[in-house]
């Protein structure tokens, strides 16, 4: 990670600084032997030009993306500075999420726990579509925790197609999930559907989910970018890969770099499943971006008997995590019952996922109650 340099977000021996030149995004790569003073001078120069810096630490270098272009900058302005090795043009429309800026995979860490997203360990998120009652939530939490999930999902706010459908328990649901974190040690991931709900979700959850319907809610994306909680961004039902990455760019451009993506199926002509799960997106994202990517086979298929097979496939193709809906009584669920697994089915899914994870060089780390001390609120 390196030692922070005053006047610059962070630094190491080899540093990249990015800046937009004549409408284009540039990377300024420092020489390996560049001093902290030289790094600081480049950062200060960029700040004087009216840009905003975004530190992207990596194993071999730290990249500082610069946004907020207020005018043209001649490439030579930075090339001639002491310690600068080269200036590289980035042509992609998305900048901060691009591997051109950060070569290493982003790993999201959570205070007070060993749980991570994006590392060698496979992140497992499980729980009901919606928090319906304290009894229901704890019944599911006990089972998914025992099976090995590190993260608990549950909707306190539910964006529904019909205004007459169950809309969630709101803050009361968030309080129940906070109790579950305390009891079982699982980190909490739940959806914010607008700026108002995001304020409350940030108070209770460890990670904020932005759902498919809000993937291009740019006001909400920017608000999440100004927050301090990691964000799980789901792909829109008809979004292209570039549109998906550009949505993530909105969040990073506001200063929140702890973002994970989630493929949850797209709308096609097929009618044998609720959506068509696009597993080809996983390697495509990993080639273009440093952000971790989940797969949600529950929404991706909409059918219980398809969830486990597609979970196996997602792990095999290289997904960094799974998001699976589990309900103690799916036939009585207030939402998404047909795609929710019974707890026994989730147990079997985890057994199979561990086997496949080992084949592709991944593990499924455990998380316990002992790790709840110091967990961020």
Language-model segments: which ranges?
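Glycine-rich, proline-tolerant flexible connector loops at the mouths of alpha/beta enzymes
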Residues: 153-171, 328-340
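Alpha-helix-loop-beta-strand connector modules within alpha/beta enzyme cores
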Residues: 167-189, 224-230, 279-293, 339-361
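Catalytic alpha/beta core domains of metabolic enzymes, predominantly
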Residues: 227-326
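Non-catalytic terminal accessory/regulatory regions of metabolic enzymes
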Residues: 17-124, 367, 372-376
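Intrinsic, low-complexity polybasic segments
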Residues: 2-4, 9, 14-15
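Active-site-adjacent beta->alpha loops and helix N-cap segments on the catalytic face
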Residues: 101-104, 162-175, 196-197, 212-228, ...
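Catalytic beta/alpha-barrel core
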Residues: 31, 169, 186-196, 206-218, ...
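Active-site mouth loops of central-metabolism enzymes
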Residues: 122-139, 162-167, 187-191, 212, ...
């Amino acid at each position: 990670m390196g030692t922070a340099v005053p006047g610059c977000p962070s630094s190491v021996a080899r540093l990249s600084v990015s800046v937009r030149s004549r409408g284009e995004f540039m990377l300024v790569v420092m020489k390996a032997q560049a001093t902290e003073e030289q790094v600081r001078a480049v950062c200060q120069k960029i700040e004087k030009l009216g840009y905003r810096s975004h530190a992207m630490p990596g194993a071999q270098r730290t990249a500082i993306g610069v946004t907020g272009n207020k005018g043209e900058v001649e490439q030579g302005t930075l090339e001639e500075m002491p310690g600068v090795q080269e200036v590289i043009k980035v042509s992609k429309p998305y900048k901060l999420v691009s591997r051109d800026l950060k070569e290493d995979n982003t790993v999201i860490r959570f205070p007070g726990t060993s749980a991570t997203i994006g590392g060698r360990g496979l992140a497992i998120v499980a729980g009901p579509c919606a928090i319906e009652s304290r009894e229901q939530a704890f019944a599911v939490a006990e089972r998914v925790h025992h099976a090995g999930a590190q993260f608990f999902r549950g909707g306190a706010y539910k964006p529904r197609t019909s205004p007459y459908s169950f809309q969630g328990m709101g803050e009361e649901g968030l309080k129940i999930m906070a109790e579950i974190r305390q009891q079982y040690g699982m980190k909490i991931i739940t959806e914010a559907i607008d700026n108002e709900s995001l304020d409350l979700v940030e108070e209770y959850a460890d990670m904020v989910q932005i759902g498919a319907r809000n993937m291009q809610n740019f006001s909400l994306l920017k608000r999440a970018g100004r927050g301090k909680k990691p964000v799980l961004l789901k792909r829109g039902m008809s979004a292209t890969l570039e549109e998906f990455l550009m949505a993530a760019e909105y969040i990073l451009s506001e200063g929140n770099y702890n973002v994970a993506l989630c493929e949850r199926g797209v709308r096609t002509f097929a009618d044998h499943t609720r959506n068509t799960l696009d597993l080809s997106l996983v390697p495509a994202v990993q080639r273009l971006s440093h952000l971790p990517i989940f797969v949600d086979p529950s929404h991706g298929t909409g059918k219980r008997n398809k969830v486990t097979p597609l979970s196996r496939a997602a792990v095999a193709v290289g997904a960094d995590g799974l998001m699976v809906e589990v309900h103690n009584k799916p036939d009585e669920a207030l939402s998404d019952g047909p795609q929710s697994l019974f707890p026994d089915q989730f147990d079997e899914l985890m057994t199979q996922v561990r086997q496949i994870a080992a084949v592709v060089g991944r593990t499924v780390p455990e998380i316990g109650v002992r790790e709840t001390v110091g967990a961020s609120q």
